[in-house]
Regions:
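Metal-dependent nuclease catalytic cores that hydrolyze phosphodiester bonds in DNA/RNA
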Residues: 1-131, 138
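Short, charged low-complexity linear segments at domain edges
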Residues: 26, 188-213
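Alpha-helix initiation and N-capping motif
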Residues: 43, 54-55, 166, 190, ...
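Cysteine-cluster motifs in flexible loop/terminal segments that predominantly coordinate metals
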Residues: 45, 52-56, 208-229
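Charged/polar, solvent-exposed surface patches and flexible loops
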Residues: 48-51, 59-60, 191, 195-202, ...
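Mg2+/Mn2+-dependent nuclease catalytic core
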Residues: 96-198
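Hydrophobic/aromatic-lined pockets within catalytic cores
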Residues: 159, 201, 205, 227
Length: 229
């Protein structure tokens, strides 16, 4: 997968629903936040970490931004625009037995120290809820790890903020004729999400320099390749 597929720029999505989780967290302003309850990271920070754990160290401990950040925001904005043109969202929701939805939801957790935006929160006939994400991409016979983990993190936040069961999620590939894939969300997935969030917080709060497996595929276009040792 490309680097642009692995990063979700969460602050160019426009107005939407915001869960009432306290003024000190604020909106999804594109950076992690310091609050009275500690550091609040973004879902996109977790996806950066999964791509390469050292991204977090360079961005937040050394305060070296990515030069590509603005380009990713432009790509995400284009993705949203193209998705709106290509997808019959009402038909899609009905096919998933959705009885109610909230769109473009900013959602956060002080307890878990994470925030982000969900394209849609679906409330289903069986009494559960599910996140739905739209990707301006083709389905490649598998769901990328970062795609799934984005949905797992969203499920974690939906469960806490809405006090509702979330055992699955959906991803719509708009360039594959709006193909929708269902992703199972397990207890193991949620525990792994909590573990990774804590690993990221340790890097930011303690200044830990993480080990990483060098990958020529990932490193060749990395904006930090000249300083990473």
């Amino acid at each position: 997968m490309t680097k642009s597929e692995s990063i979700i720029a969460e602050n160019d999505l426009g107005a939407g629903t915001q869960k009432d989780i306290g003024n000190d967290i604020g909106g999804d302003d594109g950076v992690y936040a310091e609050t009275d309850s500690g550091t609040i990271i973004r879902i996109s920070d977790v996806l950066e970490y999964l791509f390469c754990s050292r991204f977090i160290y360079y961005m937040y401990c050394l305060d070296i931004p990515q030069h590509e950040e603005k380009r990713f925001k432009v790509l995400k904005g284009r993705e949203v625009h193209e998705t709106r043109k290509l997808t019959n969202k009402d038909y899609l929701r009905r096919s998933l037995d959705c009885i109610r939805k909230e769109s473009n939801v900013f959602i956060a957790s002080k307890e878990r120290h994470i925030k982000g935006i969900v394209d849609e929160v679906l409330f289903l006939e069986d009494g559960t809820a599910a996140p739905l994400e739209y990707k301006f991409a083709e389905y490649k016979e598998k769901v990328f790890k970062t795609y799934k983990f984005q949905l797992v993190l969203q499920a974690l936040l939906i469960r806490e903020n809405y006090n509702i069961e979330v055992n699955r999620a959906y991803i719509c590939f708009t360039r594959s004729n709006s193909l929708v894939k269902e992703i199972e969300i397990t207890t193991t997935d949620l525990k792994k999400a909590d573990k990774i969030i804590q690993e990221i917080l340790d890097i930011i709060q303690k200044g830990l320099y993480p080990k990483t497996s060098r990958s020529s595929r990932k490193c060749v276009d990395c904006c930090y390749r000249n300083i990473c040792v």
